[in-house]
Amino acid sequence: MRAYKQTDHQVAFGWFGGWSGEGAFMKSSLAGIPDSVDIVSIWDNGTNLSEAQRKDMAFCQNMKGTKIVYCSIIGSVGDKLTPQNILDNWEEMGYNSEQEAINAFWEYPSDESNIQAVEVSIRKYAKAIIDTLNLYGYDGFDIDYEPVAGPYTGNIVDKDEHLFFFIDELGKYLGPKSGTGRLLVIDGEPQRITTKPEIGTYFDYFIIQAYKPGSDSNLDKRLIDGKVWGPGLVETFGGVMSEELITKRTIMTENFEATDAAMDGGYPYTDRYGNSMKSLEGMARWQPRNGFRKGGVGTYHMEAEFGTSPEYKNIRRAIQIMNPSSHSLLKN
């Protein structure tokens, strides 16, 4: 399985929620995820890890070759990493607001026209994220970037120039430019990074929340020419990356937060030939209109389909469709 994951293939991805790493019920453990899943992004409970969580993650990384990445919404410098004593005691420390105290700790300037100081502060924050990933042993970072859908705003994401400082610093340690083999991925709305498209070259994967897409046409538009939820990825990044590379780095995902959808494999979907199926299968079968191979497919709250028979039946089937093998990944 570890050798398979080193090959050039369409990957299986999932956001995992409710992680505890313990208990007889494997729904809350990474060890219960199919061996053939390539990348798991921890959606919550991803810091202050217990001994059980550390062992659970190490088992999947070392025995299965699964990449475990940490997911976080990105907004402003200091989010989730500002020391608690500053958040609790900013008034006693003489600051006029919590935000003023946060900015002081991270040396973020009150005058944003001082772009050099802005850059230094943003890079300091990015390095703190790297330190956190290293502390817990993660294989990479999943940036939840949703400036419109959230909307998640802040002094990093509100300006593409600021976002570039952040991504460029992360890119020294993660992603295709780093040479480390560690992952830097972005989910949500990467297609909206229109004023500095070179940011796109720093990511291993663009992970698109193509929830309830309904058809091949919807996925084609999200990838190529847009008009579904902003521009297409190729529209945004095509000036700095080849269409083939963009396509090979694109993972389409379905929302399994609703248990009935998870158990059923998603929502109604019709391919370009008129065949009807559920959406996760449709994504797996989808061959992009441009003729290039996609990066893969995934699910949000992947753990919600643990209760299928066999467990994780739908993602197993999607993997088998994308990467046919001589033996089925579905258990008998």
Name each region found by the language model:
Residues 1-332:
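Secreted glycan hydrolases and related glycan-binding modules that recognize and/or cleave
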